[in-house]
């Protein structure tokens, strides 16, 4: 079969993959770019695209001495974050998407979006970006191609994925996930471009059965860097369900004991709950070390030994900048020091460096993220709250070598955690995998309904921290978790619920957090090794305060004890919200989850009547 003509392609395509060539030709005919370029991932390509974007004003080259090979982008104020209201799961049936996703008929959506894509790349270059999810050496890799008219996306994809010629060669004549992205800002001949092209109309659309992603109108982060949430979670979660593995919104941490034994921990936290800080934690306990394998996404699969193994499908960190500093996350700061960064929507200093809220040494003058002069007297922030740094993992001083191992690492523990000022103890072990699935399904941040100034319904539920990212029906997703539990049996990792944000009656944080969270991780290791007991509470097996190592810590032991309480009366107040939440997830919520809800109610009733001691004598969970 002869290769199709790709409008705008100079020379021959560096592939013979007929399906790929046909698809690129179709998209080029639809979007009408001036030219089509296959990306090879080289330094020369990076430099050429960066030079072009600097000339257009999209990027500012930072001070080479302070930030080598690094750039600052400032987006349109209307294009600063993921747009969940414009994110669609276009499964073949509405039931396939379920109640937590926006669904549209896939044929109707294709027709509607095709009208927007028609001519959307006029005056621009269509970049063909081949990429590999996870280590390029994986014998069975997950691959993809993103077609985009954004050089910013190409540069970001080079950091966030294994991108370029190697990935294209890996695809060969095989299958791949197809991603089409346009900022939706065509240029007529002679028309001057804007610094950050985008469109008021936005779509971020996944077609899960077809393994296809279409994104239109946004140039920002997760909307445009299609390998991130679109592929690594929404599409991958469907692939995982079909193939018997898991795609989860989890960090992967390697913790090394003083004896040199390594433990691998995955953790799922909703946003603003300290996930990136935990991923790059610096333990404060003598003799303990930590290394990072991933800060955001984990793909979990069963190894030949029957254990769950975790792989990070990404190659970079795409972190929230504000609040990141040498106290909260020194390793992230050191990673950025090495250069090769793309910063987005942070402030520019007078000497060509970057700054954001929470960083040390506030300057007297900045250019803010909107390009305006800024001083500390301003009543606005210098950096957008969702401003970002994008940097290669390999630069992190505590990057574990295993982040490049396609086998992944055996998972010893999974952590769930929200931001709860009350009710949830500092650390609790789940009773079993079914109970763990219930804990994940009802993961929440916020206050109980009876808390000061709180209203009923102020708990924000985020199952497994995956609410915006489950690519199919949430009930089926929970069933998949239960099925994994049945398959894994006694080789499954232990699961824990943590809460770094417990406050006292006076509003103070009871636990110092940050690097001191290593003390909680030590207790988790002690549980894995069977070295410590735990007390049964309404939430599970909660730590005794005496077993949390606070040696050398300037924290009142009474505060630690208070942080480890699970007051049954407070848990009672959560029940109505939790029941409403589970009902809202529809009829596909597995019966086992409702059984766990009934067990929770029984534990609360028993504890309220006879105290926590009575829980030890219960015949049921």
Curated annotation (Swiss-Prot):
Mention any one GO cellular component term assigned to this protein in its UniProt record.
Answer: cytosol
- EC code(s) of this entry: 4.1.1.32
Q: Where in the cell is it found?
A: Cytoplasm
Metabolic or biological pathway: Carbohydrate biosynthesis; gluconeogenesis
Write out the GO biological process terms. Answer: cellular response to glucose stimulus; gluconeogenesis; glycerol biosynthetic process from pyruvate; oxaloacetate metabolic process; propionate catabolic process; response to lipid; response to starvation
Under catalytic activity, the entry for this protein gives: oxaloacetate + GTP = phosphoenolpyruvate + GDP + CO2
Q: Active site: which residues?
A: 273
Print the keywords alphabetically.
Cytoplasm, Decarboxylase, Gluconeogenesis, GTP-binding, Lyase, Manganese, Metal-binding, Nucleotide-binding
Task: Give the main EC class.
Answer: lyase
- Assign the protein's first listed, main location to one coarse class: cytoplasm
Q: Which domain of life is it from?
A: Bacteria
Heme listed as a keyword: no
One Pfam entry name? PEPCK_GTP
Give the InterPro entries listed for this entry: PEP_carboxykinase_C, PEP_carboxykinase_GTP, PEP_carboxykinase_GTP_C, PEP_carboxykinase_GTP_N, PEP_carboxykinase_N
What are the binding positions for GTP in this chain? Answer: 272-277, 388, 419, 514-517
Q: Which residues bind Mn(2+)?
A: 229, 249, 296
Q: How, per the record, is the cofactor bound? A: Binds 1 Mn(2+) ion per subunit.
Q: Tell me if Manganese is a UniProt keyword of this record.
A: yes
| Function recorded in the entry | Catalyzes the conversion of oxaloacetate (OAA) to phosphoenolpyruvate (PEP), the rate-limiting step in the metabolic pathway that produces glucose from lactate and other precursors derived from the citric acid cycle.
Q: Which NCBIfam families match?
A: PRK04210.1 (NF003253)
Q: Please give the family membership noted in the entry.
A: Belongs to the phosphoenolpyruvate carboxykinase [GTP] family.
Q: What is this protein called?
A: Phosphoenolpyruvate carboxykinase [GTP]
Which species is the source of this protein? Answer: Corynebacterium kroppenstedtii (strain DSM 44385 / JCM 11950 / CIP 105744 / CCUG 35717)
């Amino acid at each position: 079969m002869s290769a199709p003509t790709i409008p705008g392609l100079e020379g021959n395509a560096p592939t013979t993959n007929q399906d790929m060539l046909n698809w690129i030709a179709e998209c080029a005919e639809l979007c009408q770019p001036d030219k089509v370029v296959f990306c090879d991932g080289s330094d020369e390509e990076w430099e050429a695209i960066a030079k072009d974007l600097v000339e257009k004003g999209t990027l500012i080259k930072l001070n080479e001495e302070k930030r080598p090979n690094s750039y600052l982008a400032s987006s349109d104020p209307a294009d600063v974050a993921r747009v969940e209201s414009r994110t669609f799961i276009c499964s073949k049936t509405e039931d396939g998407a379920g109640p937590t996703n926006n669904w549209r008929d896939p044929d109707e959506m294709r027709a509607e979006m095709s009208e927007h894509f028609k001519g959307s790349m006029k005056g621009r270059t269509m970049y063909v970006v081949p990429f590999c999810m996870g280590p390029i050496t994986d014998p069975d890799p997950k691959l993809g191609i993103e077609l985009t008219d954004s050089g910013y996306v190409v540069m970001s994809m080079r950091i966030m994925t294994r991108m370029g010629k190697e990935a294209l060669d890996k695809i060969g004549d095989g299958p791949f996930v197809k991603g089409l992205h346009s900022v939706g800002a065509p240029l007529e001949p002679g028309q001057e471009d804007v610094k950050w092209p985008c469109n008021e109309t936005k779509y971020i659309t996944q077609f899960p059965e077809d393994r296809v992603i279409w994104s239109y109108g946004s140039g920002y982060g997760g909307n445009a860097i299609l390998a991130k949430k679109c592929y690594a979670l929404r599409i991958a979660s469907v692939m995982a369900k079909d193939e018997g593995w898991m795609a989860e919104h989890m960090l992967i941490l390697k913790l090394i004991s003083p004896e040199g034994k390594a433990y691998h921990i995955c953790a799922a936290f909703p946003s603003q709950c300290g996930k990136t800080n935990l991923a790059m934690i610096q333990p404060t306990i003598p003799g303990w070390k930590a290394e990072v394998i991933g800060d955001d996404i984990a793909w979990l699969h069963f190894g030949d030994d029957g254990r769950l193994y975790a792989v990070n499908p990404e190659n970079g960190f795409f972190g929230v900048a504000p609040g990141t500093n040498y106290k909260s996350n020194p390793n992230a700061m050191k990673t950025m020091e090495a250069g090769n960064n793309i910063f987005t929507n942070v402030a520019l200093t007078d000497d060509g460096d970057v700054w954001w809220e929470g960083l040390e040494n506030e300057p007297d003058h900045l250019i803010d993220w909107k390009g305006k002069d800024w001083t500390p007297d301003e009543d606005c922030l210098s950096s957008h709250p969702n401003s970002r740094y994008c940097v290669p993992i390999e630069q992190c001083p505590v990057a574990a070598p295993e982040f490049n191992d396609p086998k992944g690492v055996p998972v010893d523990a999974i952590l769930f955690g929200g931001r709860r000022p009350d009710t949830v103890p500092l650390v609790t072990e789940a009773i079993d995998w079914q109970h763990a699935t219930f804990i994940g399904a009802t993961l929440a941040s916020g206050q109980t309904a009876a808390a000061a100034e709180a209203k009923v319904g102020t708990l924000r539920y985020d199952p497994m921290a995956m609410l915006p990212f489950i690519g199919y029906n949430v009930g089926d997703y929970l069933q998949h978790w239960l099925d994994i539990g049945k398959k894994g049996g006694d080789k499954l990792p232990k699961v824990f619920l943590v809460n770094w944000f417990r406050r006292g009656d006076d509003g103070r944080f009871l636990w110092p957090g940050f690097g001191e969270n290593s003390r909680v991780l030590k207790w988790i290791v002690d549980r894995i090794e069977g070295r410590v007991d735990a007390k049964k509470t309404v939430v599970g097996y909660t730590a005794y305060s005496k077993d949390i190592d606070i040696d050398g810590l300037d924290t009142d032991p009474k505060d630690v004890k208070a942080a480890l309480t699970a007051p049954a009366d407070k848990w009672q107040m959560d029940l109505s919200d939790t029941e409403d939440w589970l009902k809202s997830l529809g009829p596909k919520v597995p019966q086992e989850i409702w059984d766990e809800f009934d067990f929770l109610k029984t534990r609360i009733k028993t504890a309220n009547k006879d105290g926590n001691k009575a829980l030890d004598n219960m015949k049921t969970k």
